[in-house]
Design a protein with these regions (language model features):
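Cell-envelope and extracellular/periplasmic
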Residues: 29-286
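Bacterial N-terminal signal peptides
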Residues: 11-20
Length: 286
């Protein structure tokens, strides 16, 4: 995947990230002493576009000062061996991919949250604030499977919640403060067709309708926001950023899932739609 393609996708996310600061959730006031170390944690969740599937080789290999990741890599999963420490933020081939044969189409390597947070650092370079970026999603999953209340999978608990608990624990060891100003949601492709193995409950198909998807998306947003407020002990709910699913995954004439995402953003104050994906080239849909 060419660098300019990744940079364009990261730019779309970064515009939305900047909007979060204007919205005010990223500047939560703290009463601690001015010399207290401050972290802001940016979490991305969803399916394969959120994780950076088919993005080999890694491009963002030089870390920027003040930007960090949890453990060995940007992904809290994908073989990450240590969720108790911070390391400088950079891209790499996922540990689960190390022994896989690499091809022009293969490899989880360049997660979009890396370039987005790096761009944010370059544009809003406040040296008093440190950024943590984490990818928590899993490729090829429906919103049903990624939901907190799914009975088929524990992806939410093993991904999003694991990262959310890790950051405050790390900050506490450093006597630092940490907030989560926003979460990014990149998903929708696998909800364009029904499958009885991909629903909220065993043997129940996943949702495919616009209203049903929007209901689950709003429920997921509320779950993530409420968990963040509780875990990080912060006053403001994190902003929720989505994109509008597209490319070859869409089905039908009414674009049910894409319209659900757009409507949710238009109707809900704390949701931003970063934009559609159709103007950007891709590799196998990524």
């Amino acid at each position: 995947m060419k660098a300019h393609i990744l940079n364009l996708k990261a730019y779309v996310l970064t515009v939305a990230l900047g909007a979060a600061f204007n919205y005010g959730v990223a500047a939560e006031k703290k009463s601690e002493a001015s010399d207290t170390k401050i972290y802001q944690h940016f979490i991305i969740y969803g399916q394969s576009l959120s994780t950076g599937h088919q993005s080999y080789p890694a491009l963002t290999t030089e870390p920027l000062s003040g930007n960090y990741m949890i453990g060995d890599q940007i992904w809290i999963n994908q073989g990450n061996r240590n969720s108790a420490i911070l390391n400088p933020l950079k891209s790499s081939l996922a540990l689960t991919e190390k022994r896989s044969p690499l091809s022009r189409n293969g490899g989880i390597a360049e997660c979009p949250i890396v370039a987005a947070v790096n761009h944010l650092r370059l544009k809003i370079n406040d040296p008093s604030v440190n950024y943590i970026a984490t990818s928590t999603g899993v490729g090829g999953k429906t919103i049903d499977q990624l939901s907190k209340h799914c009975r088929n999978k524990n992806i939410y608990q093993e991904g999003f919640l694991k990262a959310a608990f890790a950051a405050p624990q790390i900050a506490a060891k450093e006597n630092a403060t940490v907030t989560c100003p926003l979460v990014i949601w990149m998903q929708g492709e696998y909800n364009y067709w029904a499958d009885t193995t991909r629903g909220l409950l065993p043997h129940i198909p996943n949702v495919v309708g616009k209203d049903e998807y929007k209901t689950l998306m709003l429920r997921l947003k509320n779950d993530m926001q409420n968990d963040v407020v509780s875990i990080y002990n912060q006053h403001s709910k994190p902003l929720f950023i989505t994109y509008q699913v597209g490319a070859q995954y869409t089905r039908g004439r009414t674009l049910n899932i894409g319209m659900a995402q757009l409507e949710a953003a238009n109707e809900t104050e704390d949701i931003i739609c970063a934009g559609p994906v159709y103007p950007m080239t891709d590799r196998g849909g990524h």
